[in-house]
Amino acid sequence: MKTDLVNKINQSTAHRKSRVYLSNYIIRHEELLNEFISIAFDIQNENHVKAFWSLEFVCEKKLKLFTPYLDLFCEVLPKIKDDSAVRPATKICMFLAKSNHRKNGISLSQEQEHHLIEALIDRLIQDEKVASKVYAMKALFVLGKKYDWVHEELKTIIEQDYANHTAAYQAATRNLLKKLNK
């Protein structure tokens, strides 16, 4: 028998309104977060992608709810293959990197930072959609403020790939390259 949460995830769609509704439901019912995260992180689960769609909004609104799951997220991140889950996962990485950089934000351990950096660099090198690559670049740029070598690696990857990508990718990377060249 499916739980109420599983039914809600199953009924959700890619439409923003649906994803926001489910994320608000999870925020209001924090006791369901563990089950929700388990579904999102189980890449064999038929609802894994749908759960990730709404997890992005949970993290955008209440990132601190996600902190107990950071180690597990770092473990699952490189294993995510479905493009529809990769995009929200890389966006969550961006939220984590930005929050980690703020004084009153969440604190990632050095090991978590290294796991994120490794997974994000892999995403840039792999054949991913532009949105996923842009979120990965933004997260790496922030993480590179602490680890200088990350900026050098990011710059090298962007410059090598620049001519081979779409106009959308080139537009997104142009400003980042300017910041990296300062």
Segments the model singles out, each with a brief description of its role:
Residues 1-182:
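Alpha-helical scaffold domains
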